[in-house]
Every structure is written in structure tokens, then in C-alpha cells.
Amino acid sequence: DANGNYDWTKSAGQQYFMQQAKKYGVDHFLLFSNSAPVQFTKNGKACANKGVSGSNLADNHYADFAKFLTTTTKHFTDKGYNITLIDPVNEPQYDWTEGQEGSPWTNECIAKLARELDKSITDQGLSAQILLPEACQWKALYQDGTEKRANNQIEAFFNTSNSSTYIGDLKNLKR
């Protein structure tokens, strides 16, 4: 919640499936996020407003969202789940407006979140790694799109000449 409290009884259905997967021998888990918690979003919702091209995550909550992701990872790791990957953004090329949980992202916003998440993983002493880039279609990884969203991500994130979006040097980025 807005005070930093966690209710671990929420998302009981997802937790049930994790328990069953572990019971049947799954030994690696990936945590991903559709949206930041609403207390961290610009509009107070888990979806973006129409016409928004950048992230719905408020500029002053990148570190908070990263901490939320790592606190959640630590909680489930402590419960015996081998959380190996954290995917902080889901299909960032889409609008994700009313009726669908999610957020559009630009490469700049993703890189900013990745840097905060890298710090938080290190601070919490986790072994999980960041899974990026993330795309709804293969072409978003290597082509420019019509929207000013997460496109041509391989170039943006891994070419050292892209100083605002380069994340290839992050310690906790999956290679």
C-alpha cells in the first residue's frame, strides 16, 4: 500500500499456481509486472490514459517500484521459490489503456527503471537477474516502430553510443 505495507494474501490464484508448479518440479521462476502498484502510477490506475506514449510510472517512483519488485522477489525466495528472473515491464509497445492492466514504455523509461532495479537487486543481495529487452513482437527488438515507445531495443540498450538508454553494463542484467 501507500505506506509500504505488503499483504501477502493477495493474488492467491497466482500463488496457488506457483505452489503447484513447484510441487510438480518447476525449479526456476520468473516474476513479471504488468503495472506498477497504483500508488506509484501517474494516474492512480494500473492502466495508462489514452494518448500516453511513455510510462504510467510517476517520475518520482522509479526507485520505489524497483524496491517493490525486489521486496516481492525476496519474499518468494525466502518462501523457497527459486526466482531467477525479474521482467519489470510487459509488452511495452502497447497502449494498455482502460480495461487492461499494463503500461506503455519508452526505451528511456525502461533504462531508467532497469538502473534502479539493478541497484535494488544488489542492495537486497538477491541472485535474480533482470530480463530485458521485452517485446510484444520480435520486430520491436530490432526495428524502429511508428510509436515513440520501446522499439529497436537491442540497439538502444546494448550499443554503448546510446548513453541515455545503454544498460549493457548492469551487473544484474541477464546475458
Q: Which role does the model predict for each range below?
A:
Residues D1-N151:
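Substrate-binding cleft and catalytic face of glycoside hydrolase catalytic domains
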Residues T9, Y16, D123, E155-R175:
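Glycoside hydrolase catalytic-domain groove-lining segments
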